[in-house]
Swiss-Prot record:
PROSITE patterns: SEMA. This is Semaphorin-4B. Inhibits axonal extension by providing local signals to specify territories inaccessible for growing axons. Gene3D superfamilies: ligand-binding face of the semaphorins, domain 2 (3.30.1680.10), YVTN repeat-like/Quinoprotein amine dehydrogenase (2.130.10.10). It holds the Pfam family Sema. Residues 34-510 form the Sema domain. Interacts with GIPC PDZ domain. It is a single-pass type I membrane protein. SUPFAM superfamilies: Plexin repeat, Sema domain. It comes from Mus musculus. The gene is Sema4b. InterPro entries: Plexin_repeat, PSI, Semap_dom, Semap_dom_sf, Semaphorin, WD40/YVTN_repeat-like_dom_sf. Keywords: Developmental protein, Differentiation, Disulfide bond, Glycoprotein, Immunoglobulin domain, Membrane, Neurogenesis, Phosphoprotein, Signal, Transmembrane, Transmembrane helix. Glycans are attached at residues 53, 56, 83, 129, 397, 512, 567, 615, 680. Residues 725-823 are cytoplasmic.
Amino acid sequence: MGRASRSAVLRRALLLLLLLLLLRTTTTRALGPRISVPLGSEERLIRKFEAENISNYTALLLSQDGKTLYVGAREALFALNSNLSFLPGGEYQELLWSADADRKQQCSFKGKDPKRDCQNYIKILLPLNSSHLLTCGTAAFSPLCAYIHIASFTLAQDEAGNVILEDGKGRCPFDPNFKSTALVVDGELYTGTVSSFQGNDPAISRSQSSRPTKTESSLNWLQDPAFVASAYVPESLGSPIGDDDKIYFFFSETGQEFEFFENTIVSRVARVCKGDEGGERVLQQRWTSFLKAQLLCSRPDDGFPFNVLQDVFTLNPNPQDWRKTLFYGVFTSQWHRGTTEGSAICVFTMNDVQKAFDGLYKKVNRETQQWYTETHQVPTPRPGACITNSARERKINSSLQLPDRVLNFLKDHFLMDGQVRSRLLLLQPRARYQRVAVHRVPGLHSTYDVLFLGTGDGRLHKAVTLSSRVHIIEELQIFPQGQPVQNLLLDSHGGLLYASSHSGVVQVPVANCSLYPTCGDCLLARDPYCAWTGSACRLASLYQPDLASRPWTQDIEGASVKELCKNSSYKARFLVPGKPCKQVQIQPNTVNTLACPLLSNLATRLWVHNGAPVNASASCRVLPTGDLLLVGSQQGLGVFQCWSIEEGFQQLVASYCPEVMEEGVMDQKNQRDGTPVIINTSRVSAPAGGRASWGADKSYWNEFLVMCTLFVFAMVLLFLFFLYRHRDGMKLFLKQGECASVHPKTRPIVLPPETRPLNGVGPPSTPLDHRGYQALSDSSPGPRVFTESEKRPLSIQDSFVEVSPVCPRPRVRLGSEIRDSVV
């Protein structure tokens, strides 16, 4: 293959790469929200609480009556009134709890950052009973736990007046950056965290109890886990087999059963029985019911896995019917690092979870660390199961009475072979979700699950699950950019959502139906909280069929606006009541813009001039932003209307009647009528009616940047390929240039002494050539034969050697001859 053919192949390959990259950039689309509300907008009521010199608001707890919100931050706790504390100047209770000086000093000595790490970060804030709260903090890498008296909101003290403090090891993480989970069940604390300073001793434990229990560290039941959530499911209610209540833990860990070139992260669900007391001889004070299974969340088309679990919300609408419990999980993928990291929302049913735990086991070979499916007979009672009626029939009423063979089997069979499969609800390529809260909302005709999703850049997405997809209702910027949503807490009875971040806590109403002024907007929002009354959009929960003058309208699944909004009168949101259009006064030969702000991101604009669609001309043009660019002239005036089109429904957004007025007339009219609406952006240098390029219907700026980047990349590749193909010639060229650049040096003249050779033969009659060594070459007359006496210098001074610092072969003078030496 010649050089020309190779260059042609390279060009074709580069063109193919360019085409693939362009196709990739144009086909990747994200599922976006219908409405976007920026930070500080008046369209959405968002109240924020922040205390001076306090940061890292991580722990949230709502009282049973919903009137008090307890907040845990860095070295401080707060009791907020849900109605007053979020108002400017509202009152609240504050409890300072900082790590003492000794702990901070020891933390600093151990190599931790004194300002960042050696503080007390509140990680646990839970109700212990009707009078006290349980709280735990990192306490400068030496975790502590304390009790808060609810009535006075102070730390509980003993009879001597000292604050009651307990060691938080095994209950609270040492590092504030470590993820952990905790919950209280019947006064007992169940936690999933690390119990060592180095963070290499993870454990699922039970404390605050007369029967402390934990996982066995020596058996490697947990592999570097990151706990995200835990849940209590009362499975004993209505159980025909007499089952026990269970506590579920959700986390991500290293999957030892997979053999890849890198550590594979796996999402897990683990469970323990509430009545587990450990074994009598084997697994003493260790869980005898610990089992774990893999949570599988992947794309249905190609099976791409989302294997990193970020958060789980347990939805149990009816505690009496725990079988309908749903687990909503937020997942990301470890293979999205370095690019825009996407997220996936998957839902797991209680039936799928139980099916995995009732299936086959995996067994690990301790010598080879190989995992395989256990196909041999399983001992009875079933290892890892709670004490049921079948066990009680065998006189086994407690885990302390379990046979040793059952517990020994559990040591190596704690991982289930089956996976907990899910249903993918939402795939979001352009947002990283971190927290989730779910509210089951009763609509006018059905019940819907509304998801509140917190992102890593301070946004909140509100979405509703439909029969075939998930519709993102709105997007709220609740925190500044760069501040992730650290926690979400839903007050379903009060209709409020609380979110926390590094800078504070915000209170967001779950719905704002007044944001939708027309019947079309109200129905197209697909918000289960809202319904159209015939004249306004109101909360659907306020609907009383007996008192309403007409039935309210709501269509979450279909949003059939054309049929349901026929009899509803609507008006443009920017029209003055009683006038067909908005009067706009412009000056001659000026460039003016007519705004058309759409409420929905999913709608498109249609500009109409005197009943006909606007076409690009010298006098008007639609900008990429959707606004209309208008040149002030007497030609082409009339009525300009902007229509919003969404899912086939068209409604008027704005209507303008521009009027060109001379400056003198305009000044007189201003003095007489007040201040009219004048839209003037800039003057044009072209004459009135002349053609000028004011913009384009579509902007290709992003495509232009992509093409420029790819062109530069292709040129760099071609240049590197050229250098590679001619590397030998370049080396020779550089070598010759370096040798030629060396300046000749003046060689000292050495006069040999006038002595005769020992053999008595006189010197040759041919005159000696005294040219310098750089003037000699190998093309000179052939070498002459020297005698042994001539080869040997007459004296040490007769020999002269000089080596060039660049050229590798030195020149050597032997007697009267100068030659290249071979080194």
